[in-house]
Amino acid sequence: MPIGETQSLAIKLDNTGHRFLPGQKIRIALSTAYWPFVWPAVNNPTLTLAEKPACLSLPMLVNLEEKDVQPNPPVAPPMSAITQKRKPNSNRDVEYDFNENKVKLKIKDDLGKLLYHKHNLVTSAIKHEYYEISNNAPLSSMAQISWSFEYSRDNWMTRTITETIMTSDEKYYYLKAKVRAYELSLIHISEPTRRLV
C-alpha cells in the first residue's frame, strides 16, 4: 500500500449476527497490529481514517421468521467408554515487564489424559505457547510453541515432543524447530532451521 496516499478500501467484517435495539451504538476499531495472531509489520505503520467518505454499511435481515437450517442433522455414533485420568486445563497469563518494556503472553493447554476402554489406549496432549514483543519494536517479536503427545497401552508407550521458535529481521522470518520421538526411550531427534522470505 502506498505510504502517505489516501486509499479507498472495502473491509468485509467477520460474518456475524447481532440485533440492535433502538438507541444502541456500534463502534469499530481499526488497528495495524493483531499480535500474536498476525506477525507485526517491520516499520510499525500508522493508520489514519479519513472522515469523509467513511461509512459503515450493515445488512438487514427483514424476514425474522425462524428457519429450519438443517432439517435432518447427522447423528453421531454412540460415545465409547472413556475414563478421564487427568482433567483438561487451560491457563493464559499476560506479563508486562516494565524494566525491559516487553509484553509476554504464556498459554498452557492441557487437553487431559484419557483411557479408551474399547482398545485400552491411553492418550495425552499438552501445548505450551509463549509470545513476547517489545513496545514500539516489532523486530523483537518472538513466538515459541511446543506440543507433547503421548500414547500408551499396557507396557508400550510412544511420545512426541515438538518445539518451534519463530523470530524475524527486516528481510526474513526465521524458523527453528525440534522434534523428539520416543518409544519408551528417545529414538529420533531432528532440529531443522529455516530462513523464509
Model-derived regions, located:
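Glycine/threonine-rich phosphate-binding loop and adjacent beta-strand/alpha-helix elements that clamp
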Residues: 1-190, 194
